[in-house]
């Protein structure tokens, strides 16, 4: 998907809280919004080049969103709103092989006590719930999730297990917002309970997908499946 707004390059200075950062744009210090509540400490380092997307809301306090950053020469998209859009585009373009038969694609549907990113149905009304997680934590080509403990993430996985037990389809897709990576694993050091839940889900028949993305300064799109090591 192409970014539908003006994109500017800036230099990252600091991040006083989860939602805001200071950058240098056109030789001036500017406060911008960070659409990612994760830590991103290994990405957002003082002096790195970042991409800003012009906001569409008039008179907002932060005129730009910080959506991506260069880690060395590698561009990483950190916008937490992007993964669902990229996955929806991939579903409609039949790029996720196991899910190509699901033509009815609905966003943000509730089952039990959780709201899932997608509810899919095929022509025979078989139902499949899909949860999406954006991944930005990378080291030497290997990626992990989460970068901070996530009770909500574990809850989603346990709900997916229950959906599978009821005879419906269930899956979780880790969308890696980076290009050149070769492996995905749960981040047991940061959140061992999430990793335990993910391994249990695999055992119970929940589908686990991991895909990297083509990331440029103009667009981001789902690219290839990545090896999953649980």
Curated annotation (Swiss-Prot):
Pfam family name, one: SfsA
One GO MF term attached to the UniProt entry: DNA binding
CDD domains named among the record's database cross-references: SfsA-like_bacterial
InterPro entries recorded: SfsA, SfsA_C, SfsA_N
Family indicated by similarity: Belongs to the SfsA family.
Protein name per the record: Sugar fermentation stimulation protein homolog
Gene: sfsA
């Amino acid at each position: 998907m192409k970014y539908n707004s003006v994109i500017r390059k800036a230099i990252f200075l600091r991040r006083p809280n989860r939602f805001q950062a200071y950058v240098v744009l056109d030789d001036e210090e500017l406060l911008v919004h960070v659409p990612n509540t994760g830590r991103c400490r290994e990405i957002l380092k003082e002096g790195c080049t970042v991409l800003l997307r012009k906001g569409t809301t008039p008179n907002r306090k932060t005129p730009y969103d910080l959506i991506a950053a260069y880690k060395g020469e590698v561009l990483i998209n950190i916008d937490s709103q992007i993964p669902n859009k990229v996955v929806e585009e991939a579903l409609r373009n039949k790029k996720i092989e196991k899910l190509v038969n699901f033509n009815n694609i609905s966003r943000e549907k509730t089952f039990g006590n959780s709201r899932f990113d997608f509810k899919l149905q095929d022509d025979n009304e078989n139902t499949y719930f899909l949860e999406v997680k954006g991944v930005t934590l990378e080291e030497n080509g290997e990626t992990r999730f989460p970068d901070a403990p996530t009770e909500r993430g574990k809850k989603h996985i346990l709900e997916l297990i229950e959906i599978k037990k009821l005879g419906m389809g269930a899956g979780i897709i880790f969308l890696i917002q980076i290009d050149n990576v070769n492996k995905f694993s749960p981040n047991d050091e940061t959140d061992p309970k999430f990793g335990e839940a993910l391994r249990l889900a695999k055992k119970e028949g929940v589908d686990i997908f991991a895909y990297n993305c083509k990331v440029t300064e103009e667009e981001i799109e789902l690219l290839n499946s990545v090896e999953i090591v649980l």
